[in-house]
Design a protein with these regions (language model features):
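Short, small/acidic-rich helices and loops at N termini and domain boundaries
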Residues: 1-93, 372-381, 385
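Glycine-biased, small-residue-rich flexible motifs in mid-sequence functional cores and linkers
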Residues: 1-6, 80, 86-385
Length: 385
């Protein structure tokens, strides 16, 4: 077994070690600079870091438990797929910005492009119950930032997150190193919410999906603050689009401040309760943003010219309108869906039964129409907006 394989085995054993203190191990790694350097420290030093006896034993070369070895074997089997990656703290693919944080994870599970994972990232987060204003701006901001060479990082949640991912995916084109990164609050072998299965796959195929949680981990509420910390840790800054006063997005913004990241906030209508968190952030010193160029300027990137009509989405209009009132850049499938919805409201299964397209194609087409504000979905029933 090579030294790299031994290092990976040790990392997996430490990761799955029962009774271990993950924050203590992360801080020790941050202080020592590598797992290899941590292995060379004395037991006394390891104890001062707060490492458990079982962690100290593993670092001293003692064998891992049968349970830890079995879980490590499961990870290695998962990583046999060429698109699956186990990225340890010592790996050359471990994101440098994340390595610089106070509590970097020992291990990342990654699906997709390692180049995307290591690219310049800007986090876009916000309400799961976003208004049309929030969804449209999330899509527009993400699309324009991605076109300028910025990878968009978000959390795969409903609302703002999903629309940010879609905007980046639609802008990425042929540049495989710039797209979007989805950070999960579950194991990477689970999709949460389940409705985003098609979006998850599209991100894995064209960007990167990342998790610090073990395979099989369910969507427990206490996982999501850790996910939010990872989102901000991967990014140079965090843009908050619609957030209530008590919102997980504000937790992400707080982590960003602690990690010395820039915080940006999109203002909203005063009557919109989902925008109050953004207004509070602006009061506290977050940069008010109403144009992607505001962020590009702060990042030292070349500002993009004002969006041309028909070139991309904007908060107020989606391309050149033709006589039907539809954007002229709709796909044929989307036109068929709108044509049917003009005659009757439909459930998703109705479109499937009509054999118009595959599940994934329908899901993406309808989600894109929702983002554009052309259809709405309530209780699973689609209608013309």
């Amino acid at each position: 077994m090579s030294s790299d394989d031994l290092q990976l085995r040790l990392a997996l054993s430490l990761f799955h070690c029962k009774g271990g203190h993950a924050p203590a191990l992360s801080r020790a790694l941050r202080h020592q600079g590598s797992l290899k350097a941590l292995m060379a420290t004395t037991r006394e030093a390891q104890e001062q870091y707060g490492l458990s006896l079982s962690q100290q034993a593993l670092l001293s070369g003692e064998p891992a438990s049968a349970e830890s070895l079995a879980l490590g074997d499961k990870d290695l089997e998962w990583a046999l797929d060429s698109e699956h990656h186990l990225v340890t703290y010592d790996s050359i693919f471990y994101p440098e910005r994340l390595r610089e944080t106070d509590c970097p994870p020992l291990l990342l599970y990654v699906r997709g492009s390692l180049a995307t994972l290591g690219s310049l990232q800007l986090a876009i987060v916000g309400s799961r119950n976003a208004s049309d204003y929030g969804k449209r701006n999330a899509y527009w901001m993400a699309r324009e930032l991605c076109k300028a060479g910025v990878t968009v990082c978000s959390g795969l949640a409903l609302g703002v997150d999903a629309n940010a991912h879609l905007g980046a995916l639609d802008a990425a084109g042929s540049d495989a190193s710039v797209s979007t990164v989805a950070v999960l609050g579950t194991g990477i072998d689970r999709v949460y919410p389940a409705a985003h299965r098609a979006l998850f796959q599209r991100i894995a195929d064209n960007g990167a999906v990342v998790s610090e949680f073990p395979l099989g981990m369910r969507a427990y509420a206490y996982n999501f603050p850790r996910r939010n910390r990872l989102i901000s840790g991967l990014s140079v800054g965090v843009l908050v689009i619609e957030a209530a006063i008590k919102s997980g997005s504000l937790i992400t913004a707080r982590y960003a401040v602690e990690q010395n990241r820039e915080v940006y906030a999109l203002p909203s209508l005063l009557s919109n309760p989902q925008g109050r968190g953004c207004h509070e952030l602006i009061k506290q010193g977050a940069m008010l943003v109403d144009d992607p160029n505001d962020i590009l300027f702060e990042l030292g990137l070349k500002a993009r010219e004002a969006t041309e009509a028909g070139d991309t989405l904007s908060p107020t209009g989606f391309g050149n309108l033709i006589d039907t009132g539809e954007p002229n850049d709709l796909q044929p499938l989307q036109r068929k869906l709108l044509q049917r919805l003009r005659t009757e409201d439909c459930l998703f299964d109705s479109f499937l039964d009509a054999d118009l397209a595959s599940f994934g194609a329908l899901n993406h087409a309808l989600l894109d129409l929702e983002v554009r504000g052309l259809v709405s979905c309530r209780g699973g029933r689609y209608t013309i907006a």
